[in-house]
UniProtKB/Swiss-Prot annotation:
Signal peptide: none
Protein name, per record: ATP synthase F(1) complex subunit delta, mitochondrial
Quaternary structure note: Component of the ATP synthase complex composed at least of ATP5F1A/subunit alpha, ATP5F1B/subunit beta, ATP5MC1/subunit c (homooctomer), MT-ATP6/subunit a, MT-ATP8/subunit 8, ATP5ME/subunit e, ATP5MF/subunit f, ATP5MG/subunit g, ATP5MK/subunit k, ATP5MJ/subunit j, ATP5F1C/subunit gamma, ATP5F1D/subunit delta, ATP5F1E/subunit epsilon, ATP5PF/subunit F6, ATP5PB/subunit b, ATP5PD/subunit d, ATP5PO/subunit OSCP.
A single MF term (Gene Ontology): proton-transporting ATP synthase activity, rotational mechanism
Family statement drawn from the similarity comment of this UniProt entry: Belongs to the ATPase epsilon chain family.
Transit peptide limits: 1-33
Function: Subunit delta, of the mitochondrial membrane ATP synthase complex (F(1)F(0) ATP synthase or Complex V) that produces ATP from ADP in the presence of a proton gradient across the membrane which is generated by electron transport complexes of the respiratory chain. ATP synthase complex consist of a soluble F(1) head domain - the catalytic core - and a membrane F(1) domain - the membrane proton channel. These two domains are linked by a central stalk rotating inside the F(1) region and a stationary peripheral stalk.
Localization in the cell: Mitochondrion; Mitochondrion inner membrane
Main subcellular location of this protein, as a coarse class: mitochondrion
InterPro entries in the record: ATP_synth_F1_dsu/esu, ATP_synth_F1_dsu/esu_N, ATPsynth_dsu/esu_N
Organism: Dictyostelium discoideum
UniProtKB keywords: Hydrogen ion transport, Ion transport, Membrane, Mitochondrion, Mitochondrion inner membrane, Transit peptide, Transport
Length: 170
């Protein structure tokens, strides 16, 4: 009886190893005709890009900056305020400032970036960014309650990232 259990366990272990070795870690089923990623950049009020081809999209993840290209491992990532950099199919580089959001990287070499706001870097007004940074720094320093301090900190961190993106110093 024990030998039968051991034999069954060994067979199960061997089949489990075979199953685990078939796991995919990259989007290997993606189209073999292109070395490009298909991405969409979306906000609630605007579709900036829909199914656009790119070589690479660099994103400001909550756990650090990361790049997405064709064959990237599927994932869902929280995005923090920062810069999205798009290396387009033709080699052109484009940058957007986003307010945060989520990125969905799929096994079919597609990526959906959902954000509340996305603004081309060249459309950021340096003077407005400087004023916003000063305003939220003051709000943060003056905040007495935890809730007010947390709200001010969100604004401060967002404006700090905007300042960095457009080259404004404090």
């Amino acid at each position: 009886m024990i030998r039968s259990i051991i034999k069954s366990s060994n067979n199960l272990l061997k089949s489990n190893v075979a199953i685990n070795s078939n796991k995919r870690f990259f989007a290997t089923e993606a189209s073999a005709t292109s070395d490009l990623l298909t991405f969409s950049l979306l906000s609630p009020h605007q579709t900036i890009y829909k199914d656009k081809k790119a070589q690479l999209v660099t994103l400001p993840g909550a756990k650090g900056i990361f790049g997405v290209a064709k064959n990237h491992v599927p994932r869902i990532a929280e995005l923090k305020p920062g810069v999205i950099q798009i290396n387009h199919e033709n080699g052109d580089l484009e940058k957007f400032f986003i307010s945060g959001g989520f990125a969905f990287v799929n096994p079919d070499a597609s990526c959906y970036i959902n954000t509340i706001e996305a603004v081309p870097i060249d459309q950021l007004d340096a003077e407005e960014v400087k004023n916003g940074l000063a305003r939220y720094t003051q709000l943060y320093n003056d905040a007495q309650e935890e809730n007010a301090k947390a709200v001010a900190l969100i604004g401060l961190e967002t404006y700090q990232q905007m300042a960095f993106a457009c080259g404004v110093s404090a």
